[in-house]
Curated annotation (Swiss-Prot):
This is Sodium/potassium-transporting ATPase subunit beta-1-interacting protein 3. It is a multi-pass membrane protein. Belongs to the NKAIN family. One of its GO terms (cellular component) is plasma membrane. It is found in: Cell membrane. The chain crosses the membrane at residues 5-22, 35-55, 62-82, 151-171. Keywords: Cell membrane, Membrane, Transmembrane, Transmembrane helix. Its main location: membrane. Interacts with atp1b1 C-terminus. It comes from Xenopus tropicalis (Western clawed frog). It holds the Pfam family NKAIN.
Length: 181
Protein backbone atom coordinates (compact mmCIF):
# COMPACT_ATOMS: atom_id res chain seq x y z
CA UNK A 1 0.00 0.00 0.00
CA UNK A 2 1.13 3.52 -0.74
CA UNK A 3 1.66 6.22 1.81
CA UNK A 4 -1.41 8.25 0.87
CA UNK A 5 -3.99 5.49 1.06
CA UNK A 6 -7.33 5.95 2.73
CA UNK A 7 -6.08 3.80 5.58
CA UNK A 8 -3.08 6.06 6.25
CA UNK A 9 -5.30 9.11 5.98
CA UNK A 10 -7.74 7.63 8.49
CA UNK A 11 -4.85 6.93 10.87
CA UNK A 12 -3.78 10.56 10.51
CA UNK A 13 -7.35 11.85 11.05
CA UNK A 14 -7.81 9.65 14.13
CA UNK A 15 -4.50 10.81 15.56
CA UNK A 16 -5.45 14.42 14.95
CA UNK A 17 -8.86 13.82 16.53
CA UNK A 18 -7.21 12.34 19.59
CA UNK A 19 -4.84 15.29 19.97
CA UNK A 20 -7.66 17.81 19.63
CA UNK A 21 -9.81 15.83 22.09
CA UNK A 22 -6.95 15.67 24.59
CA UNK A 23 -6.47 19.43 24.34
CA UNK A 24 -10.17 19.95 24.89
CA UNK A 25 -10.16 17.48 27.77
CA UNK A 26 -7.45 19.46 29.56
CA UNK A 27 -9.40 22.71 29.40
CA UNK A 28 -12.65 20.99 30.40
CA UNK A 29 -10.85 19.58 33.45
CA UNK A 30 -9.59 23.05 34.31
CA UNK A 31 -13.17 24.34 34.19
CA UNK A 32 -14.70 21.33 35.98
CA UNK A 33 -17.00 20.71 33.02
CA UNK A 34 -18.01 17.15 33.91
CA UNK A 35 -20.35 16.40 31.00
CA UNK A 36 -17.75 17.32 28.35
CA UNK A 37 -15.06 15.49 30.33
CA UNK A 38 -17.10 12.30 30.17
CA UNK A 39 -17.87 12.81 26.47
CA UNK A 40 -14.23 13.52 25.63
CA UNK A 41 -13.13 10.44 27.55
CA UNK A 42 -15.51 8.21 25.61
CA UNK A 43 -14.45 9.88 22.37
CA UNK A 44 -10.78 9.23 23.05
CA UNK A 45 -11.49 5.56 23.78
CA UNK A 46 -13.50 5.11 20.58
CA UNK A 47 -10.88 6.93 18.50
CA UNK A 48 -8.23 4.58 19.91
CA UNK A 49 -10.52 1.70 18.95
CA UNK A 50 -10.83 3.15 15.44
CA UNK A 51 -7.06 3.52 15.21
CA UNK A 52 -6.59 -0.07 16.32
CA UNK A 53 -9.16 -1.29 13.81
CA UNK A 54 -7.52 0.66 11.02
CA UNK A 55 -4.01 -0.51 11.82
CA UNK A 56 -5.04 -4.15 12.40
CA UNK A 57 -7.54 -4.37 9.50
CA UNK A 58 -10.52 -4.92 11.82
CA UNK A 59 -13.60 -3.52 10.09
CA UNK A 60 -15.87 -4.10 13.10
CA UNK A 61 -13.83 -1.69 15.18
CA UNK A 62 -13.89 0.84 12.38
CA UNK A 63 -17.68 0.43 12.18
CA UNK A 64 -17.90 1.18 15.92
CA UNK A 65 -15.80 4.29 15.33
CA UNK A 66 -18.04 5.28 12.42
CA UNK A 67 -21.21 4.92 14.49
CA UNK A 68 -19.62 6.89 17.32
CA UNK A 69 -18.74 9.77 14.98
CA UNK A 70 -22.46 10.30 14.36
CA UNK A 71 -23.05 10.60 18.11
CA UNK A 72 -19.99 12.81 18.46
CA UNK A 73 -21.23 15.19 15.77
CA UNK A 74 -24.61 15.36 17.52
CA UNK A 75 -22.94 16.08 20.88
CA UNK A 76 -20.84 18.86 19.39
CA UNK A 77 -23.87 20.37 17.68
CA UNK A 78 -25.50 20.39 21.13
CA UNK A 79 -22.42 22.11 22.60
CA UNK A 80 -22.60 24.76 19.88
CA UNK A 81 -26.30 25.31 20.53
CA UNK A 82 -25.64 25.43 24.28
CA UNK A 83 -22.98 28.13 24.08
CA UNK A 84 -24.83 30.15 21.45
CA UNK A 85 -28.02 29.81 23.54
CA UNK A 86 -30.11 28.30 20.76
CA UNK A 87 -33.47 26.73 21.51
CA UNK A 88 -33.88 27.86 25.09
CA UNK A 89 -30.47 26.63 26.22
CA UNK A 90 -28.42 28.95 28.40
CA UNK A 91 -24.66 28.96 28.83
CA UNK A 92 -25.19 30.30 32.35
CA UNK A 93 -26.77 27.08 33.64
CA UNK A 94 -24.93 24.32 35.46
CA UNK A 95 -25.83 21.75 32.82
CA UNK A 96 -22.21 21.01 31.87
CA UNK A 97 -21.31 20.28 35.49
CA UNK A 98 -24.35 18.02 36.04
CA UNK A 99 -25.74 20.71 38.39
CA UNK A 100 -23.24 19.80 41.11
CA UNK A 101 -21.20 23.00 41.02
CA UNK A 102 -21.27 26.55 39.71
CA UNK A 103 -18.13 26.18 37.60
CA UNK A 104 -18.14 27.43 34.04
CA UNK A 105 -15.90 27.13 31.02
CA UNK A 106 -12.24 27.75 31.80
CA UNK A 107 -12.16 30.10 28.82
CA UNK A 108 -14.70 32.38 30.51
CA UNK A 109 -12.00 33.85 32.77
CA UNK A 110 -8.82 32.89 30.95
CA UNK A 111 -9.58 33.62 27.30
CA UNK A 112 -7.21 35.55 25.08
CA UNK A 113 -6.82 39.09 26.39
CA UNK A 114 -9.21 38.61 29.30
CA UNK A 115 -8.56 40.61 32.43
CA UNK A 116 -10.39 39.49 35.52
CA UNK A 117 -10.70 40.92 38.97
CA UNK A 118 -12.43 39.90 42.16
CA UNK A 119 -15.36 42.07 43.12
CA UNK A 120 -17.62 41.87 46.15
CA UNK A 121 -20.59 39.62 45.53
CA UNK A 122 -23.97 41.29 45.51
CA UNK A 123 -25.90 40.57 48.71
CA UNK A 124 -28.65 38.91 46.69
CA UNK A 125 -26.29 36.13 45.51
CA UNK A 126 -25.25 33.40 47.89
CA UNK A 127 -22.05 32.04 46.36
CA UNK A 128 -20.78 30.24 49.43
CA UNK A 129 -16.99 30.05 49.26
CA UNK A 130 -16.84 31.21 45.64
CA UNK A 131 -15.73 34.65 44.57
CA UNK A 132 -17.56 36.94 42.22
CA UNK A 133 -15.30 37.66 39.25
CA UNK A 134 -15.59 40.42 36.70
CA UNK A 135 -14.02 39.66 33.32
CA UNK A 136 -13.33 42.37 30.76
CA UNK A 137 -11.25 42.99 27.66
CA UNK A 138 -11.50 39.57 26.05
CA UNK A 139 -10.37 39.50 22.43
CA UNK A 140 -12.78 36.65 21.73
CA UNK A 141 -15.62 35.71 24.05
CA UNK A 142 -15.43 32.30 25.71
CA UNK A 143 -18.54 30.93 24.05
CA UNK A 144 -16.99 31.45 20.62
CA UNK A 145 -13.86 29.59 21.69
CA UNK A 146 -16.05 26.68 22.79
CA UNK A 147 -17.96 26.86 19.50
CA UNK A 148 -14.67 26.80 17.55
CA UNK A 149 -13.56 23.73 19.53
CA UNK A 150 -16.82 21.97 18.69
CA UNK A 151 -16.71 23.02 15.04
CA UNK A 152 -13.21 21.57 14.67
CA UNK A 153 -14.42 18.35 16.29
CA UNK A 154 -17.35 18.19 13.87
CA UNK A 155 -15.11 18.79 10.86
CA UNK A 156 -12.64 16.10 11.91
CA UNK A 157 -15.46 13.67 12.68
CA UNK A 158 -17.11 14.17 9.31
CA UNK A 159 -13.82 13.66 7.49
CA UNK A 160 -13.10 10.64 9.69
CA UNK A 161 -16.56 9.24 8.94
CA UNK A 162 -16.00 9.46 5.19
CA UNK A 163 -12.56 7.88 5.36
CA UNK A 164 -13.76 5.19 7.78
CA UNK A 165 -16.53 4.22 5.36
CA UNK A 166 -13.98 4.08 2.56
CA UNK A 167 -11.54 1.97 4.59
CA UNK A 168 -14.32 -0.42 5.63
CA UNK A 169 -15.26 -0.79 1.98
CA UNK A 170 -11.66 -1.46 0.93
CA UNK A 171 -11.04 -3.97 3.73
CA UNK A 172 -14.26 -5.90 3.06
CA UNK A 173 -13.56 -5.92 -0.69
CA UNK A 174 -10.07 -7.31 -0.01
CA UNK A 175 -11.54 -9.98 2.27
CA UNK A 176 -14.13 -10.91 -0.36
CA UNK A 177 -11.52 -11.14 -3.11
CA UNK A 178 -9.35 -13.39 -0.93
CA UNK A 179 -12.29 -15.73 -0.25
CA UNK A 180 -13.11 -16.15 -3.93
CA UNK A 181 -9.61 -17.15 -5.04
Amino acid sequence: MGCCTGRCTLIFICTLQMLVALERQIFDFLGYQWAPILGNFLHIIVVILGLFGTIQYRPRYIVAYTIWTAFWVAWNVFIICFYLEVGGLSKDTDLMTFNISIHRSWWREHGPGCVWRLVPAPPSKNLGDHSFISVTGCIIEFQYIEVIHSAVQILLSLIGFVYACYVISVITDEEDSCRHK
